[in-house]
């Protein structure tokens, strides 16, 4: 949520800042601003409410702002309404300190009251202005030493934050600090870059540094210096980003989401290949040994949003194949419950960005209680990747659309591979069955491509449903997990009210919501539950529902019940989520397109939720 881009070097800063901010639009925002300084001159600040193009128009695409040092920001309102006044950057009373901030300062009112007593005045409703003026207060108190000033402010701020600060007394320099909010540093040919995420600076450099929690950075004269909370210098090594800038472009597709849907065969294949060696699953890169796999008596899966839906699907697969008890929790609930945890348990935390605030907090809680932790993440060097005991990296590449598709699919693959290996090591499946499962996994990319090649039928049907008022997804067992993700895709990008229900629960209240014309989508990939779900669909139809069925090739008798049916290739039933979710992603996408909505940046949503 929110985005920060900063630059100091030899080129004009403002166009670079605007370009970087455009690569962070997927994070969600309601206003934007720039602060640029030209040598010894005072910093110029320009802000605009609304989309980034308004800021670009105000600054002639950045060319109207002279200067080679600057900070930029896209704001997601938390404290104070969306407005130019509340937009970042913010400044101290005398303009000596200028800064931007991501995150939430929990004790901002307490700090604000302190500063009011010290004679400070406030022009905005934001917690960011409080942080900037707190730094200014300590800067004056500790005799013009930026590192000490920021250090003292960090000690007193409670909450999560990433800060980029410029000081009038230090032209050409930028100071950065973070706690529980992501920030990266890039260096190339004497130029220094700061960003909330890699795509913002990938056009300029692939050499990045990840700032640790409660660390600070000084960028000056083409070099970066890292400090700990005590103000002592620390050494860091850069990380080389493997993917290129083109991977974060639309490549001819109308939307990033459609591009990323079509990238799923490759993303799934790449993630599989990362752990498949000589026809077997090799988890050495993950760091889990066979002895450890045998020792776990319980698995906890913790995640948010679509990653939580991955967890629900993987629960079924792990329990079925490995006969291992699995508990799935929303990270925002897990972290606040005082529940007993099995000391021999494994806590799996799933997060595309590796920075999801609640998931990161849940990981830290699990580690504090002494449990082994495993992160399934897509971003190398992210907070969860650094702090988890073990990491399974998905190879989805950059995912720009807010609604996840390929990251979700690669997370499923990670879960499948863990489940299959657990099952073999624990003696729950034979070697022959193990090889069969791996063969089925290797078929998934081609099967996903087959579904994508036949997407026109889904596009046609979706256009007819653009005016739907309610959509209900129903399924049993693993099909319920699929329904959860299908429903989320529908509601988050088409703004149609949608819910997913375990089909067996319909009679316990939900069926009262069914009326003439209500679209009900039944998911039926599990053969043992097929007839029961058909019966539930018939119950809905008798109350006026319009039925769509989603099942595997061969189940053609569903056409006696459903008015429209989508078929997916047959696979091992425990892997069916990977195929059945594709038509539901396309359904949500095409409904949104038919309604003329902003598919990649739906209202009120952010790609990476880095605040609680």
Question: What spans do the regions from the language model cover?
Answer:
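Glycine-rich oxoanion-binding loops at beta->alpha junctions
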Residues: 68, 72-85, 275-291, 314-350, ...
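Generic C-terminus detector
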Residues: 546, 561, 571-612
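Structural beta-sheet core signal
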Residues: 4, 99, 165, 176, ...
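Catalytic-loop motifs flanking and including active-site residues across diverse enzymes
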Residues: 127-130, 310, 314, 410-415, ...
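Glycine-rich phosphate-binding loops that contact phosphosugars or nucleotide phosphates
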Residues: 294-443, 523-569, 587, 595
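Conserved short alpha-helical segments that host acidic/polar catalytic motifs at enzyme active sites
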Residues: 1-254, 263-295, 336, 431, ...
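Active-site phosphate/pyrophosphate-binding segments
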Residues: 264-268, 272-300, 390-519, 592-612
């Amino acid at each position: 949520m929110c985005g920060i881009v900063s630059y100091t070097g030899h080129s004009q800063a403002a166009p670079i800042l605007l370009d970087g901010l455009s690569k962070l639009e997927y994070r969600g925002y309601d206003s934007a601003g720039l602060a640029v300084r030209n040598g010894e001159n005072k910093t110029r600040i320009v802000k605009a409410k609304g989309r980034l193009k308004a800021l670009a128009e105000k600054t002639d695409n950045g060319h109207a702002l002279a200067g080679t040092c600057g900070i930029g920001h896209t704001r997601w309102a938390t404290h104070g309404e969306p407005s130019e006044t509340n937009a970042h950057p913010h400044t101290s009373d005398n303009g000596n300190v200028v800064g931007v901030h991501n995150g939430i300062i929990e004790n901002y009112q307490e700090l604000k009251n302190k500063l009011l007593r010290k004679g400070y005045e406030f022009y905005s409703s934001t917690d960011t202005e409080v942080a900037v003026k707190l730094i200014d207060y300590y800067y004056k108190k500790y005799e013009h030493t930026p590192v000490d000033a920021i250090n003292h402010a960090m000690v007193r701020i409670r909450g999560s934050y990433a800060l980029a600060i410029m000081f009038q007394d230090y032209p050409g320099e930028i100071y950065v600090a973070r706690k529980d909010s992501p920030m990266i540093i890039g260096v190339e040919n004497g130029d220094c870059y700061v960003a909330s995420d890699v795509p913002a600076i990938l056009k300029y450099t692939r050499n990045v540094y990840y700032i640790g929690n409660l660390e600070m950075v000084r960028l000056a004269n083409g070099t970066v210096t890292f400090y700990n909370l005590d103000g002592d210098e620390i050494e860091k090594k850069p990380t080389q980003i493997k993917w290129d800038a083109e991977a974060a472009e639309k490549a001819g597709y109308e939307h990033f989401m459609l591009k990323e849907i079509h990238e799923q065969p490759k993303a799934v294949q790449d993630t599989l290949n990362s752990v498949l060696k000589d026809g077997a699953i090799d988890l050495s890169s993950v760091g889990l040994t066979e002895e450890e796999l045998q020792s776990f008596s319980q698995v906890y899966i913790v995640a948010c949003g679509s990653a939580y839906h991955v967890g629900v699907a993987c629960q079924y697969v792990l329990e079925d194949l490995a006969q291992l008890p699995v508990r799935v929790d929303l990270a925002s609930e897990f972290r606040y419950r005082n529940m007993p945890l099995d000391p021999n348990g494994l806590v799996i935390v799933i997060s595309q960005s590796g920075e999801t605030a609640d998931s990161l907090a849940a990981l830290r809680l699990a580690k504090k209680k002494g449990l082994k932790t495993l992160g399934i993440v897509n971003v190398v060097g992210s907070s969860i990747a650094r702090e988890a005991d073990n990491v399974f990296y998905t190879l989805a590449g950059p995912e720009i659309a807010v609604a996840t598709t390929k990251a979700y699919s690669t997370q499923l693959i990670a879960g499948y591979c863990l489940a299959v290996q657990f099952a073999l090591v624990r003696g729950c499946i034979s070697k022959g069955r193990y090889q069969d499962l791996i063969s089925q996994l290797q078929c998934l990319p081609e099967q996903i491509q087959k579904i994508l090649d036949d997407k026109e039928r889904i596009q046609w049907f979706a256009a007819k449903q653009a005016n739907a008022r309610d959509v209900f997804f129903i399924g049993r067992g693993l099909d319920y997990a699929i329904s959860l993700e299908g429903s989320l895709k529908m509601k988050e990008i088409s703004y149609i009210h949608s819910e997913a229900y375990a089909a067996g629960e319909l009679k316990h209240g939900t069926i009262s919501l069914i009326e003439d014309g209500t679209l009900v989508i039944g998911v039926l990939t599990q053969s043992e539950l097929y007839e029961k779900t058909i019966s539930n669909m018939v119950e809905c139809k008798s109350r006026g529902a319009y039925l769509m069925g989603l099942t595997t090739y061969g189940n053609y008798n569903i056409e006696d019940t459903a008015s429209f049916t989508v078929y997916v290739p047959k696979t091992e039933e425990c892997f069916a989520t990977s195929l059945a979710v594709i038509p539901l992603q396309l359904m949500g996408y095409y409904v949104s397109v038919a309604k003329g909505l902003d598919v990649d940046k739906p209202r009120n949503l952010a790609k990476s939720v880095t605040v609680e």
